[in-house]
Amino acid sequence: MRIAIEITYLVSSILFIFGIKFLGSPKTARKGNLYAAIGMFMAIAATLLDQEVLTYEWIIIGAIIGSAVGLILAYKTPMTGMPQMVGMLNGFGGGASTLVALAEYFRLNPNYPVDTGLPFNLPIDTGIAIVLSLLIGGVTFTGSMIAFGKLQGLVTGKVVKYPLQHPLNLILILVVLAGGVLILLDPTNIPLILIITAISLVLGVLLVLPIGGADMPVAISLLNSYSGLAGSTTGFVLGNNELIIAGALVGASGIILTNIMCKAMNRSLMNVVMGGWASAGTEGPAPDSKARKGTAKSIDAEELAMLLESVSSVVVVPGYGMAVGQAQHAVRDLMNVLEKKGINFRFAIHPVAGRMPGHMNVLLAEAQVPYDKMLSMEDINDDFPNTDVVIVIGANDVVNPAARHDQSSPIYGMPILNVDYAKTVIINKRSLNVGYAGIDNELFFYPNALMYFGDSKEAMSKLVHEIKAL
């Protein structure tokens, strides 16, 4: 039986690896998701068949409740709520790792729940794994819950700063590590293990609270990596090779994705790890219009429809405003009606647009937009000078030309979509208010830029109607 279980773990690990590989391409993402799901089912089945399982009653109850909650969330959560869902699931993974580490500590402790006076010979490797599981799992759980709250509007999406932010975070981490050393020296110290857990939970809040709502894609990616690392350390606690491999895969892929997104924002990974993300700017009201250079020109739906009648290429840049307005279906209708007129229609996706990695891709895919229409910043940037019209929907800082030349700007050096190089730029926003970097977007006042004010869904639907009426 033991050999069969280990073989099953090996096969499921291979499925996880291929699953992640296939998830790297939109065309094979469904296959990758299926492979990973099959691998997880096999891993769960092998674990339940392990001879160390003494009773199945609570396992069955937990599986039924968890499956029911998962199904309800899957069916009830709209695509626009995916960032919140991902954040919450990351938290559940971290919370599970924390609980498993605590449970294993108390299971191994001969003086719990009754002090027997027996020596507690906690193996060093197991003790280290337990402390790391508590630290990483605790940070992941509370950090992910704060991220969920920010995305859901339950917690302010603004940057929240507090005195001695970085030193305090560093001190708390060192306290946890020092406590871990003391646990190895005296494993019977139950209050200390609870203190380590509590500090880890507090640390998660303090690390994520300073992160602004617009920087959630990086935070979600990093927390996803943490959840994988927490799972991997829990695998060491339990001596489960499958959990070690699966957690390592998630942790490594999450770190790689986080690093890529940091480069896309011209920020350092260490700044994110220490909870200092978004320190360059804060949300706030629009500055006095007198400080702006020039005057923004506007266009209405009828005029824009007439403009689009005479072009041959259109690129749409989606942003968080499209997600908030749930305008992806209206944008797809715009694509369909313009392509019928022979217009080359594409999408330009910035790596950190939205509130989670791949947020815009998920929304557009849900609206049945073909994958080959979604181009990355690297693929589309050189083609903007040859583009007749760019329509920016709810994006702001990722198209601000100040990032290229204004060294005093908080977004200076951040790679952006060079939409200002196009012949005409249409910006759909509710107002001229600033983005999350807290600065004006000079693009709004460029001679080739026109503001198309209004809610994204309503504005795109009205535009489609006007085009059809021509």
PLM regions with names:
Residues 212, 227-270:
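Mobile "lid/hinge" segments at catalytic clefts and subdomain interfaces of large enzymes
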Residues 1-13, 50-68, 126-141, 187-199:
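Structural signature of hydrophobic alpha-helical transmembrane segments
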